């Protein structure tokens, strides 16, 4: 249920107004974007989320709520409340592991997601790449970064293979192994895009695992594996630039040294793949 409010609420104000009987249990810090916290009352649990990026428009947070509202509960948490700077969703019981599940199981989850109705907004990477360049630390902007950005701008994004709703942040920390199967959390980057973009963005351990995931997905989607892998590879430069730029952007926002280390590692990967 969406509520409108022009004045942001503190955590205590939010809980006392909307969940007076609930109390905070623990804070999650599973991803690089930030944390959420868990509230509980008589065994009922919800996850309270806030925007990870304080500079992002409110519409981005609202889109996450809308995406969750239309997704089936078998793959995503059900949302219960949306307010400016606050969202409450179901807590998904299960285990969050440090490694990806079997590639066939993960391919099945992604294929099922990609069969759902589209969200209604497109994922376009170039505006994000340019935003991260503009909002990064000027001392970190290099000639090589600008050259790669201009190259991608000229080349344009790969032509779509299949347009579907995407999660766009699939890694071990965002997968809940529940009694009823795999589920995805943290949908803040969700939107409509190429299925190969989703597959390219999965945080895999190595190329062999990546190829196997693509092959398993291709079998379900009735696509030639070699064709799908070629399309996935076309997205690699875009994804690496997206990751590097996002790490640079978050470094300037937070000053957290982990983002510098991750950015440097991603730039090295880009140089290797050129």
Swiss-Prot record:
Protein name: Thiamine kinase
EC number of this enzyme: 2.7.1.89
Pathway named in the protein's UniProt entry: Cofactor biosynthesis; thiamine diphosphate biosynthesis; thiamine phosphate from thiamine: step 1/1
Functional note: Catalyzes the ATP-dependent phosphorylation of thiamine to thiamine phosphate. Is involved in thiamine salvage.
GO molecular function, one term: ATP binding
Keywords attached to this entry: ATP-binding, Kinase, Nucleotide-binding, Transferase
Source species taxonomy: Bacteria, Pseudomonadati, Pseudomonadota, Gammaproteobacteria, Enterobacterales
Organism: Escherichia coli O6:K15:H31 (strain 536 / UPEC)
Keyword Transferase attached: yes
Gene Ontology biological process: thiamine diphosphate biosynthetic process; thiamine metabolic process
Gene label: thiK
């Amino acid at each position: 249920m969406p509520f409108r409010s022009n004045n942001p609420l503190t955590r205590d104000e939010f809980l006392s107004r909307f969940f007076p009987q609930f109390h905070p249990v623990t804070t999650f810090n599973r991803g690089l974007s930030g944390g959420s916290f868990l509230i509980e009352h008589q065994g009922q649990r919800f996850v309270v989320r806030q925007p990870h990026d304080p500079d992002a428009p409110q519409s981005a947070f609202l889109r996450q709520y809308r995406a969750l509202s239309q997704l089936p509960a078998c793959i995503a948490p059900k949302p219960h409340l949306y307010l400016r700077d606050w969202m409450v969703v179901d807590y998904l019981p299960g285990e969050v592991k440090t490694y990806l599940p079997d590639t066939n199981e993960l391919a099945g989850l992604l294929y099922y997601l990609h069969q759902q109705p589209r969200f209604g907004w497109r994922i376009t990477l170039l505006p994000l790449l340019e935003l991260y360049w503009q909002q990064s630390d000027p001392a970190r902007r290099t000639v090589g970064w600008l050259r790669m950005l201009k190259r991608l701008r000229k080349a344009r994004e790969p032509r779509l293979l299949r347009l579907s709703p995407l999660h766009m942040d699939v890694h071990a920390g965002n997968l809940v192994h529940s009694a009823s199967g795999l589920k995805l959390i943290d949908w803040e980057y969700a939107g409509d895009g190429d299925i190969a973009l989703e597959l390219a963005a999965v945080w895999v351990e190595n190329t062999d695992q990546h190829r196997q995931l693509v092959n398993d997905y291709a079998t379900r989607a009735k696509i030639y594996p070699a064709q799908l892998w070629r399309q996935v590879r076309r997205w690699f430069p875009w994804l690496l630039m997206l990751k590097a730029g996002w790490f640079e952007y978050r470094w300037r926002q937070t000053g957290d040294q982990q983002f510098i280390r991750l950015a440097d590692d991603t730039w090295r990967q880009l140089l290797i793949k050129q």
